[in-house]
């Protein structure tokens, strides 16, 4: 399951219309009644650099806390996305959408964690999904802290080649724990959460591009400076040997 920009933008636009009629609280209530459970925060803490990389991946911006998803914040973001769609330039449009997402910090990451939780509870591909997802996103955004979100993403996030959790993925990719990673590897790790199409051993250029995007966002978030960003971007990926069950790369 990926951080799906197109699906999320469409959902925000639809929710914005619903929010304009103050339907979001009702939808959230229905979803809460249909949900088997709500996620609980992780008890282990994500290392600082990895957490900043995941925050950048989820478009948290410079915010230090989450912003509640409610009819007013949804309507504001929906208006922003509608304005962004007016641009004829794809790159400019994508950049504007990124800025719109920051109006509700890390809403992509919140939506992703909600989806991971729903699938773990067996609520997937059935009629309850839209209601439960709205309820879960609303609950997480209004009651969790930034730290709780990052800790839970690091613990439960899915990474390429079937790794679950940032520490497991770090040991698989780099041969050491997430706490031991330097900036280049922490940024690469954070950039791959929620990805399924990137094999860093087979697609090093694509992996490096993902890392650069996260490094640029970390710089924009003031988590790192220009010099650190450039040095990390020039660094090798730092991968260890692929796991024994790794399939050969296609030609």
What are these regions (language model features)?
Residues 150, 229-230:
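Short loop/turn and capping residues at structural boundaries
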């Amino acid at each position: 399951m990926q951080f799906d920009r197109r699906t999320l933008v469409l959902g925000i636009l639809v929710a914005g219309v619903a929010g304009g009629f103050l339907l979001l609280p009702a939808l959230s209530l229905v979803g809460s009644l249909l949900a088997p459970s709500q996620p609980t925060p992780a008890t282990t803490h994500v290392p600082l650099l990895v957490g900043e990389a995941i925050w950048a991946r989820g478009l948290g911006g410079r915010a230090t806390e989450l912003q509640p998803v409610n009819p007013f914040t949804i309507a504001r973001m929906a208006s922003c996305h509608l304005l962004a769609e007016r641009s004829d330039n794809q790159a400019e449009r994508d950049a504007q959408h990124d800025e719109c997402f920051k109006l509700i910090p890390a809403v992509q990451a919140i939506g992703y964690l909600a989806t991971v939780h729903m699938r773990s509870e067996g609520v997937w591909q059935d009629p309850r999904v839209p209601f439960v997802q709205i309820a879960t996103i609303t609950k997480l955004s209004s009651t969790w802290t930034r730290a709780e979100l990052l800790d839970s993403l690091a613990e439960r996030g899915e990474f390429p080649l079937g790794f679950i959790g940032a520490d497991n993925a770090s040991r698989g990719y780099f041969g050491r724990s997430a706490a031991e990673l330097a900036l280049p590897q922490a940024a690469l790790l954070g950039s791959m959460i929620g990805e399924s199409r990137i094999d860093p051993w087979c697609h090093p250029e694509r992996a490096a591009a993902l890392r650069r995007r996260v490094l640029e966002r970390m710089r924009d978030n003031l988590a790192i400076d220009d010099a650190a960003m450039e040095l990390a971007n020039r660094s090798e990926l730092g991968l260890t040997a692929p796991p024994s069950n790794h399939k050969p790369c296609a030609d």
